[in-house]
Amino acid sequence: MDLCEESETFLENKENKKIEDAEETALTFHCPDERSERNHVCCLLGVSELTLEEDGRASEFTISTGWEEAVHGWGRTSPTACIWSKKKVRRGRVGEGTSGGSNCLFCMSLSQGSLEPRPLSAAGKLEEAAVAEVSSQKNWGSEKNWNSPSQGPASREPNKLCFPTYLHGEKKSLQMKEFIWCMEEWGIPEAVSSKACRNPSSSTDQGLSISDAVATKALVVLPPLKSSSHNLDSLSKKSRNIFWQPEEKVLGVEKDECMACPDELKGVDGKGEKAHFELASRLKVTNILPFPPTVTRTHLLSAESQRCCLHWSLLPQKSSVFPPNPTNIHYLATLQVLGQQGGQNCRTRLKAKEAKPPRTTPKHIVTEAKQESRPHVLESKVFPKPLLPSLTVSRVVIPVSTHRVL
């Protein structure tokens, strides 16, 4: 009996040992060290960071609402993206404005203060009032009659404000104003002006054509120079009839003056009348001719063209009839200085060392020389109005609300 009890206790102890060994091996298999636990936690943290990055990339393409989200997400979205409001804006009627068609706060703020659609009959009155306002704001010295009956409606087109005309069923665009100011008159052909005078602007089709014409003329920098050639020819003909002298007389005067004073200034008699005549004849040849081939006049024209920025072929080509001579240029400069100082300085400084035989001159030439003894200044009549460009200024005003967009 004792042997049987010992064997049973031995077997029970073995089984208990096996169970304890199995539990210890299971514990050591699941968590053998602390390093494995740390590695497992690091893997979980890495997965969470990856998910956060993916969520952030997905939110970059969404347009956020609110002021802070708009400021933070402005670099993520395009600069032309619209900020949409959460509240539902009521739908407007057709042709009422841009607020009914879209709920964009930025577009709604731009469209505030725009013109309401008005009939075409009232548009003409608005244009006339705008012409009066523009003419009152100008501070130029030119006094012109913009609303004179001689000018047709086509000539007053550049002075009007371009108010947009809306048709039925068409939505209103942003407020756009075009201020077109003209210092000089536009060169309009006679056929167009006669047609404009015969057909007054009363129908709706002509109102639309006026706005189109203003829009096309806003792109033109310089007016057409069609009437400039006629005025230039008439000016040259008048100047030839009044001031032109034959080449023989001019050459004779130059020869006499060069023979009289080759090195220094040589006066004539002590009376001073012939000195006045020489001074006036030289100034008449140099300063009064429309386009002479001398040095002083071309210098004035080049300075005037550089001041006005006129890149046209106004200056004539150099001709070989009058070759430049340094003695003549020096003599001209001294004569101009003498003409400015007066007749007394002419008598004192133009004293001859060698006597010169008196020459007979007609009386009417002497009287003209006395009247024109002063140097002739370049007048503005040399350049007619069609040659000068008219200044056009086009400006587009888009009103933006100053309040913060929410």
UniProtKB/Swiss-Prot annotation:
It holds the Pfam family DUF4529. Residues 136-153 have a biased composition (Polar residues). Residues 136-157 are annotated as: Disordered. InterPro entries: DUF4529. It comes from Rattus norvegicus (Rat). GO terms for cellular component: cytosol; nucleoplasm. This is Uncharacterized protein C16orf46 homolog.
